Amino acid sequence: PQLGLPFPRV
């Protein structure tokens, strides 16, 4: 669960 750009990651 982490905020990853351009898509969220686990």
From Swiss-Prot:
One of its GO terms (biological process) is neuropeptide signaling pathway. It comes from Ergaula capucina (Beetle roach). The modification Valine amide is found at V10. GO terms for cellular component: extracellular region. This is Periviscerokinin-3. Mediates visceral muscle contractile activity (myotropic activity). The keyword Nucleotide-binding does not apply. It is found in: Secreted. Belongs to the periviscerokinin family. Signal peptide: none annotated. Keywords: Amidation, Neuropeptide, Secreted.
